């Protein structure tokens, strides 16, 4: 697809949901690009249940929810281009994509940024020093648990988001 109607940057929950809704509404072609090799964003690393309660009215693990969202977007007609990065956008709206098929320029009608949540490193928050051994961010902990790596036996949880429980 050389010139999509919409180029969605980010294949996490928001990007996949937007692609689905746009395709269902007849806005085609919709192309979703993501630098990761697998669609789904942060939920891919969350093995706990609770995903899908609001929109699907059932509880799923994060990876299952991510697969569901990707399949739904594709089923509606969206095209997923994974392992693909937007290297730049010119003033006229031409986007340079770099991925497994090489370098490609596309001129979408609209670029929708859905780049999601990212944990900021300490330096970005102006906190000096290194993280002590055994201190995990939420994302790190979820990745270790998903990979079945040992994370310790005692924990102190700082925070109140739903993954803290």
Residue ranges and their predicted role:
Residues 1-9, 67-154:
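FAD-binding core/adjacent interface of flavoenzyme oxidoreductases
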């Amino acid at each position: 697809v050389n010139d999509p109607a919409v180029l969605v940057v980010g294949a996490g929950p928001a990007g996949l949901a937007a692609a689905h809704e746009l395709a269902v509404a007849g806005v085609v072609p919709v192309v979703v690009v993501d630098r990761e090799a697998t669609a789904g964003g942060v939920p891919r690393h969350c093995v706990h249940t609770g995903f899908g309660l609001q929109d699907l009215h059932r509880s799923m693990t994060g990876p299952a929810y991510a697969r569901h969202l990707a399949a739904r977007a594709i089923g509606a007609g969206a095209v997923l281009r994974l392992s693909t990065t937007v290297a730049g956008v010119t003033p006229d709206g031409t986007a340079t994509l770099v991925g497994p098929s090489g370098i490609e320029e596309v001129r979408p009608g609209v670029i929708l940024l859905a780049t999601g949540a990212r944990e900021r490193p300490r330096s970005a928050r102006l906190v000096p020093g290194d993280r002590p051994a055994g201190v995990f961010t939420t994302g790190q902990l979820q990745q270790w648990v998903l990979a079945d790596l040992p994370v310790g036996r005692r924990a102190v949880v700082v925070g109140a988001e739903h993954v803290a429980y």
